[in-house]
Regions:
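Alpha-solenoid helical-repeat scaffolds
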Residues: 133, 187-190, 207, 251, ...
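Non-catalytic C-terminal accessory modules of carbohydrate-active enzymes
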Residues: 364-513
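A generic structural motif
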Residues: 4, 60-62, 72, 262, ...
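Extracellular/oxidizing-compartment recognition motifs
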Residues: 1-127, 134-135, 151-154, 171-178, ...
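Catalytic cores of carbohydrate-active enzymes
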Residues: 94-96, 110-112, 125-140, 144-147, ...
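Short Gly/Pro-enriched turn/cap motifs at secondary-structure boundaries
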Residues: 184, 304-305, 403-406
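Helix-terminus loop motifs that line ligand-binding clefts
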Residues: 14-33, 150-246, 374-395
Length: 513
C-alpha cells in the first residue's frame, strides 16, 4: 500500500544481535494489551513523499532508537533528530580540574540531573519518570551548586504539602496517583519536606519555602516522635542498591529523624517560635544521644558493624561527638583503603561518604575514591562509556539497571565542597558570608570552581607549583569570606577575606611517613 506503519522504540541497551534490549523497562511494565507499547511511537506514513513527525506530548529516555516498518524504508542517521529536553534552569556553577575523569564525571552528573528534571526531579527519564523523594534530596546540593532551580523546588514542595496526610505522613513518590503511603516511605526518603527548604535557605538566603513548609515539617516530625518515642526508628527504605554490605536501617533512619528535627528547631528559632525551639532542640539532642548510646563504640570509634555507610552517615549529619570525629573518620578511611579505595555503599552512603572523609581530615582518601575508575566506583561508569549516572554500581547487574539515574549524584556537589571548598555559612546564608574550606589532595594539580551566588560569582581556584599551592579567590561585592587552611599546608589556619580578588601562597607541608 502507499501508507506503511513505522514504529520507533526508544531504549538504553542493545542485545548482541543489535536489537534493542527492553529488559530494564519490561521488569516493571504491566501493559493491558499491545495497543500502546511503552517508550514507542507508532506513525502511519502518508505515502506522498517525505513525512515529518515529532512526539510533542511525551518524552523518552534512551541511548538507542530502533525503527521497524511494515514496508521497506531507506533511512540513515540524518532522518532522526534527538532533542534534549528538561526544565529551563540556568547554569550557576562550573568545575574544571587537571583530571579528565573528574571533569567528565561532573559533566555526566549534570547530564543525569537535567535528564531527570521535568517540572520536578525524577528518578529516571525512561522507566518510571516518578518524583522519588529520596533521589530528590540526595541530589539537592549538586542541583543548587550547578543550576538555578529554586522555582522547580518551590513547586515540588507545594506538591509535598498537597500530598501530606493529616497525620504527617508523606508518600515516597511526589506527586502520586495514590501509591507510596504504605510502603517504606520513611525518613531516608521523605525527609525532602525538611531538607529541600533548608538547602534553598542555605543557597539563596530565602526562608520563604521554609516558612511555607514549617507546619508540614512539624506534622512530619511529630508523627515520627509519636510512633518512635525512644528517638530511634527503622522507618525507611535503607541504603538502597548497596555494593555488598548492608547497613542498619535503624541507624540511618534515626539519623534522618535527627536532621529533620534539627532543621525544625532552627526554623522555630528563626521564626520566633520559642516553645517549638525549646521542644525540638531537646528532641534533637534526645535522638542524637539515643543513636550514639545504641550504635557508637566510644572506645573504638566504630558505629554499628563499621561498614562504610554506617561510619559515613553519622559523620555527614553531625551525630558524632566532636572529640571522636577524627577517630570515626580514620576508621572510615581505613575501610576505604582496605577496599582498594573502592565504594561499598548504597544511596545513603553515596550521599555521605565523600563529605564525611573530606570534612574530617581524610581528603586524600576522599579524592582517591572520587577519582577511582575501577569497580565499584563512580568513575568506573565513566571509564566504561557512560555519559550519565547509573542506577547500579555493577555494570553486569540484571535488575535496577537504568542507565540514567540521579540517586548516586551527590558527587557533583562534592566537587564544589571537598575540592573547591565553597560552602554557605548557616549564620549568614545565601553566601552573604562564604566559608572557604578547600582541600589540595596530592593526586590533583589544578582545580577551578566557580559559582554564581546571589551576590555575584565566587571563584575558588588553585594550582600546585613545586612545594606550594597558589590559591586564587574571588569574593563578590557585598560578601565576605573566611578561608580555612587544610591540614597539608602551612600558615594561618583561618584568614578573613573582603570582597575582591585574592591570591594566597600556601607552602605544602612535607609528608611524614
Amino acid at each position: 500500500s502507499n501508507s506503511s506503519a513505522a514504529s520507533d522504540v526508544y531504549k538504553r541497551q542493545l542485545y548482541d544481535n543489535g536489537r534493542v534490549n527492553t529488559s530494564n523497562i519490561d521488569v516493571y511494565h504491566r501493559p493491558v494489551d499491545n495497543s500502546d507499547p511503552f517508550q514507542t511511537d507508532i506513525l502511519v506514513l502518508s505515502g506522498k513523499g517525505e513525512d515529518e513527525f515529532m512526539a510533542r506530548f511525551n518524552y523518552k529516555g534512551f541511548r538507542y532508537v530502533e525503527v521497524t516498518s511494515t514496508n521497506p524504508l531507506v533511512l540513515n542517521e540524518n532522518n532522526l533528530t534527538a532533542y534534549f529536553v528538561h526544565s529551563d534552569v540556568p547554569q550557576k556553577g562550573m568545575i574544571h580540574t587537571s583530571n579528565a575523569l573528574i571533569n567528565r564525571l561532573w559533566w555526566a552528573t549534570n547530564n543525569a540531573y537535567l535528564s531527570n528534571l521535568m517540572g520536578y526531579p525524577t528518578d529516571c527519564p525512561q522507566r518510571e519518570k516518578n518524583g522519588w523523594t529520596g533521589d530528590g534530596h540526595f541530589a539537592i546540593e549538586t542541583a543548587l551548586y550547578n543550576y538555578d532551580g529554586i522555582t522547580v523546588y518551590e513547586k515540588w514542595l507545594a506538591d509535598h504539602r498537597d500530598e501530606q496526610q493529616p497525620n504527617g505522613v508523606l508518600p515516597d513518590i511526589i506527586p502520586t496517583g495514590g501509591w507510596g503511603y504504605g510502603t517504606d516511605n520513611g525518613l531516608d526518603w521523605t525527609s525532602t519536606i525538611a531538607l529541600i527548604p533548608w538547602n534553598i535557605y542555605m543557597f539563596y538566603g530565602d526562608h520563604k519555602l521554609l516558612a511555607d513548609c514549617y507546619e508540614n515539617i512539624k506534622r512530619y516530625v511529630d508523627y515520627v516522635d509519636r510512633t518512635s518515642p525512644t528517638g530511634l526508628t527503622s522507618w525507611g527504605r535503607g541504603d538502597w542498591v548497596p555494593v555488598k554490605s548492608h547497613s542498619s536501617k535503624e541507624l540511618t533512619s534515626s539519623v534522618y529523624f535527627y536532621v529533620d528535627t534539627k532543621i525544625l528547631a532552627n526554623a522555630a528559632k528563626m521564626f520566633n517560635k520559642t516553645e517549638d525551639y525549646k521542644y525540638y532542640s531537646a528532641l534533637a539532642n534526645k535522638i542524637k544521644n539515643a543513636i550514639n548510646d545504641k550504635f557508637l563504640n566510644r572506645e573504638t570509634g566504630i558505629y554499628g558493624s563499621g561498614v562504610q555507610t554506617e561510619q559515613s552517615v553519622p559523620l555527614q549529619w553531625g551525630i558524632v561527638p566532636e572529640e571522636l570525629k577524627r577517630k570515626v573518620a580514620r576508621n572510615l578511611a581505613k575501610q576505604v583503603e582496605a577496599a582498594g579505595f573502592h565504594l561499598d555503599v548504597g544511596v545513603l552512603g553515596a550521599k555521605a561518604i565523600l563529605n564525611a572523609l573530606s570534612e574530617n581530615g581524610e581528603a586524600e582518601t576522599a579524592y582517591k575514591l572520587a577519582a577511582q575508575d575501577t569497580y565499584p566506583s563512580w568513575g568506573c561508569w565513566i571509564a566504561n562509556g557512560a555519559t550519565t549516572l547509573l542506577e547500579n554500581w555493577d555494570l553486569n547487574a540484571t535488575r535496577d539497571i537504568s542507565d540514567n539515574h540521579m540517586m548516586f549524584g551527590e558527587i557533583g556537589g562534592w566537587f564544589y565542597k571537598g575540592l573547591g571548598g565553597i560552602f554557605p555559612d548557616p549564620e549568614n546564608p545565601g553566601f552573604k558570608h562564604i566559608l572557604l574550606r578547600p582541600n589540595f589532595p596530592s593526586g590533583l594539580n589544578e582545580l577551578e570552581a566557580r559559582y554564581q551566588s546571589p551576590y555575584g560569582e565566587i571563584c575558588s581556584k588553585w594550582e600546585r607549583k613545586k612545594n606550594r599551592i597558589v590559591y586564587h579567590v574571588t569574593v563578590p561585592a557585598n560578601s565576605t569570606a573566611t578561608f580555612y587552611a587544610p591540614d597539608n599546608v602551612k600558615g594561618e589556619r583561618a584568614v578573613n577575606l573582603e570582597a575582591g580578588k585574592h591570591i594566597l601562597e600556601l607552602p605544602i607541608k612535607r609528608a611524614v611517613y
